[in-house]
From Swiss-Prot:
Signal peptide (UniProt feature, chain positions): none
Protein name, entry field: Probable G-protein coupled receptor 152
The family this protein is said to belong to: Belongs to the G-protein coupled receptor 1 family.
Gene Ontology CC annotation, any one: plasma membrane
Subcellular location: Cell membrane
Gene name as annotated: Gpr152
Residue spans of biased composition, Low complexity class: 419-433
UniProt xrefs under SUPFAM superfamilies: Family A G protein-coupled receptor-like
Stretches assigned to the Cytoplasmic side: 55-65, 127-148, 216-258, 304-511
Length: 511
C-alpha cells in the first residue's frame, strides 16, 4: 500500500522537504502500470463472476457454507483490486496525488477494509478446518448451523471497525515543492497507528498459518496411516486448502516486510530496499486477489458445472437473437410428417397415374407367380383385373416380393410415367415401402392385409371406372388365392389354372 515516498514521513520528525535524497526517488515505473492494469483487467471480471456464481448458489440453498465463503472472498478481492486503480493513477503522475484529501482517505479506507476482511475471513476458515481435523467427533456436533453466516457478517463488521483510523488520519500533503502525496499517517500518530496496522494484520496471519499447518499435518498422518477420512465435504476441504495455501505463499512476503518496517521504525530511517520490498510485496497481494477465483474454479467441480451451465444458457440466448443460424435445420424437419402421407397416397394412386406403365410392370411380375396358368397373350388383360380388385397394398407388396424383377421392367415404359407423380414414387415411396411392407409377407400377416375391408374398399372405389370398361361382368375377389401363391410357390403353380380361368374370360377387353 505504501509507496517509497509515503513510507517514511514522521519516522524521525521529518516534515515537508526542500530537497530529495537518494532514498526519496520513486521506485515505480511504466512496467508497474502495465502489470497492475493487466491484473485489474483479469481479476475484476473474474471476481465479479465468482461473486455472482456463489451468490446464486447460496440463494438456491446449494452448498451454503462454501457459497458464503466464496461470496465474501470474491467481494474482498474485488474491492482490493478496485482500490489499486488509485495506485495506478498515482504511478502515472510520478507519485503526485491529484485527487485531494477526501479521495486519499477513501483510498486507504477501501484498501484497509478489503485487506482486513480477506485476512480475517481466511483466518476463521483455517481455524474451523483445524478444529474439524483435530476434533472430528466433537466439533461437528457442537458447531451451529448458521456459523458460516455469522462468521461472514462478523468479519465484515470487524474489518470496517479496524479500518476506521484510515477515515481520519490520511491526508494529501505537500512533500517537495508542488509534489503532493497521499499520506496515511503523520508525525506523532505514526508509531502507535503503524504498530496497530502491522500487529493487527500479522497476528491473524500467524494464527492462519499455524492452523493451516496443523490441518495439513493431520491430513498427512491420516493418509499415511490408511485411516478413513472423516471430513464429509471433500469439495469444500479441497477449495479451502487451495485458497489458504495460495494466501500463505503470496502474502507472507508482505507480512515479513511489514515486520522489518516496524523494526526500523523505532530509531532508524527506513532504507530504499525496504521501501521497494513494501511496494512489490503489495503486488503479490494483488496477484493473489487476481488468481483466487481461478483457483476456486480449479478446485471445485460444482462451480465448474455451474459455470458451464451459465455459459451454455448464455450461448443459447445469443443464438436466439440470430434466427438465421437455425434456417438450415428447418427443411430437415418439414418433410418428415409429409413423407409418410405421400407414400400412402402413392401406393394407392400408382395404378391410376398411368395404367399403361402399371400393366407393363405387372406383365413381368405376374408370370413368376403362376407361369403355367397365364399365357403371355393375356398379359395385358390379367393385370387389369388385378388392378381392379387387388388392394393397393397388394400392388406394392406384389412388386416387392421379387426384388430381382424390378430391373426387368420395360425401359421404354419408364419415360411414359406422369412426370408429376413418377419422381415422387421413385424418391419417396421406394425407400419407405420396404421396411413397412416387408414384414407383411409373413403367411399370417398377408391374409390380414387382404381381409381388411377399409383398404380394399378404398382401392376398389379408386379403380372402379377402369374396371367397368375392361370387364364384362362382376368378378369374384381373387385375394384368397394370392396368399397361397405367396406361401407355397411350388404347389399352387399346377393348381392355378383351375382358379384363374373364370377370371381370364374377358381378356379381349383392353388393347
Amino acid at each position: 500500500m505504501d509507496t517509497a515516498v509515503e513510507a517514511n514521513l514522521g519516522a524521525a520528525g521529518h516534515g515537508p522537504r526542500t530537497e530529495l535524497s537518494d532514498e526519496d526517488y520513486y521506485p515505480q515505473g511504466s512496467w508497474d502500470t502495465v502489470f497492475l492494469v493487466a491484473l485489474l483487467l483479469l481479476g475484476l471480471p473474474a471476481n465479479g463472476l465468482m461473486a455472482w456464481l456463489a451468490g446464486s448458489q447460496a440463494r438456491h440453498g446449494a452448498g451454503t457454507r462454501l457459497a458464503l465463503l466464496l461470496l465474501s472472498l470474491a467481494l474482498s478481492d474485488f474491492l482490493f483490486l478496485a482500490a489499486a486503480t488509485f495506485q495506478i493513477l498515482e504511478i502515472q503522475h510520478g507519485g503526485h496525488w491529484p485527487l485531494g484529501t477526501a479521495a486519499c482517505r477513501f483510498y486507504y479506507f477501501l484498501w484497509g477494509v478489503s485487506y482486513s476482511s480477506g485476512l480475517f475471513l481466511l483466518t476463521a476458515l483455517s481455524l474451523d478446518r483445524c478444529l474439524l481435523a483435530l476434533c472430528p467427533r466433537w466439533y461437528p456436533g457442537h458447531r451451529p448451523a448458521r456459523l458460516p453466516l455469522w462468521v461472514c457478517a462478523g468479519v465484515w463488521v470487524l474489518a470496517t471497525l479496524f479500518s476506521v483510523p484510515w477515515l481520519v488520519f490520511p491526508e494529501a500533503a505537500v512533500w517537495w515543492y508542488d509534489l503532493v502525496i497521499c499520506l496515511d499517517f503523520w508525525d506523532t500518530e505514526e508509531l502507535p497507528l503503524r504498530m496497530l496496522e502491522i500487529l493487527g494484520g500479522f497476528l491473524p496471519f500467524l494464527l492462519l498459518l499455524v492452523c493451516h499447518v496443523l490441518t495439513q499435518a493431520t491430513a498427512c498422518r491420516t493418509c499415511c496411516g490408511h485411516q478413513p477420512r472423516r471430513m464429509a465435504c471433500h469439495g469444500f476441504a479441497r477449495v479451502a486448502k487451495t485458497i489458504l495455501s495460495a494466501y500463505v505463499v503470496l502474502r507472507l512476503p508482505y507480512q515479513l516486510a511489514q515486520l522489518l518496517y516496524l523494526a526500523f521504525l523505532w530509531d532508524v530511517y527506513p532504507g530504499y530496499l525496504l521501501w521497494e520490498a513494501l511496494v512489490y510485496s503489495d503486488y503479490l497481494i494483488l496477484l493473489n486477489s487476481c488468481l483466487s477465483p481461478f483457483l476456486c474454479l480449479a478446485a471445485s467441480a460444482d462451480l465448474r458445472a455451474l459455470l458451464r451451465t451459465v455459459l451454455s444458457s448464455f450461448a443459447a440466448a445469443v443464438c436466439e437473437e440470430r434466427p438465421g443460424s437455425f434456417i438450415p435445420a428447418e427443411p430437415q424437419t418439414l418433410p418428415g410428417p409429409t413423407s409418410e402421407g405421400q407414400s400412402r397416397l402413392d401406393s394407392v394412386v400408382q395404378p391410376q397415374v398411368n395404367p399403361s406403365v402399371q400393366l407393363q410392370s405387372d406383365s413381368v411380375v405376374q408370370p413368376e407367380v403362376s407361369p403355367s396358368a397365364q399365357p403371355q397373350s393375356d398379359s395385358v388383360a390379367q393385370p387389369t383385373v388385378g388392378s381392379l380388385i387387388q388392394p393397393p397394398l397388394d400392388t406394392v407388396v406384389q412388386l416387392e416380393v421379387n426384388p430381382l424383377t424390378q430391373p426387368q421392367l420395360d425401359p421404354m415404359a419408364q419415360p411414359q410415367v406422369n412426370p408429376s407423380a413418377q419422381p415422387q414414387s421413385k424418391s419417396v415411396v421406394q425407400p419407405q415401402v420396404d421396411p413397412l411392407t416387408q414384414p407383411q409377407l409373413d403367411p399370417v400377416a398377408q391374409p390380414q392385409s387382404n381381409t381388411e375391408t377399409p383398404i380394399p374398399a378404398f382401392g376398389d372405389e379408386s379403380a372402379s371406372n377402369p374396371g367397368e370398361e375392361n370387364s364384362s361382368g362382376p368378378c369374384p375377389d381373387p385375394t384368397p388365392g394370392t396368399p397361397e401363391n405367396l406361401d407355397r410357390p411350388a404347389v399352387p403353380q399346377e393348381k392355378s389354372p383351375s382358379n384363374v380361368p373364370p377370371e381370364e374370360a374377358p381378356s379381349a377387353g383392353p388393347t
